[in-house]
């Protein structure tokens, strides 16, 4: 009698071994520009990845993503993208777009979740541990263009604290600091700093109520 469970387990082991081999070969293309920690999902190789000369992409241990081509990452010359332990670039709701301009830096803390969002840094974006960005949201540290002949393009780093939840279709603009334990409601536009421990809503986003600590939320 054929042991179907054993056959399935053997097939899964073979698929996993093949994935690891292909992942190792894929990593070699980037050399020292790509640094990968332990227990990183081999699905990383499905990333549409460009890491230019002099740039670095550091992937912390336990990185996760799905087995699809939903992540688009471009680290330009002299730029750096650093993902902390157990970061999840989730693609089930849509693609993620992460762009690091020349000399800029994006840093995501431990256990951050990016779910179908866009991050673009001309100078820098930093997210603290256990923070999340929802589907269709954007974090931009620059205007990208001159407003007029008298108003040049402006860039200023963005800082997002720990245990922050940025909901769907939110825009976070340059120079903003968001404190710890904050929730930014859907479709908000964040143009100014948000203090810790609040729910912020609207255009522009303003605190509407205080929140308790988010450190002990259920899994």
Model features per residue range: what roles?
Residues 144-145, 188-189, 195:
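Flexible glycine-rich beta->alpha loop in the catalytic core of nucleotide-sugar glycosyltransferases
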Residues 152-161:
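Glycine-rich NAD(P)-binding loop of Rossmann-like domains
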Residues 147-150, 165-167:
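A mid-sequence, solvent-exposed acidic-amphipathic segment
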Residues 143, 150-151, 176, 194, ...:
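Conserved catalytic-core motifs of eukaryotic protein kinase domains, centered on the activation segment
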Residues 157-158, 175-176, 191, 197:
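A short, glycine- and basic residue-enriched loop/turn
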Residues 167, 173, 185, 190-191:
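Short hydrophobic beta-strand segments in globular cytosolic domains
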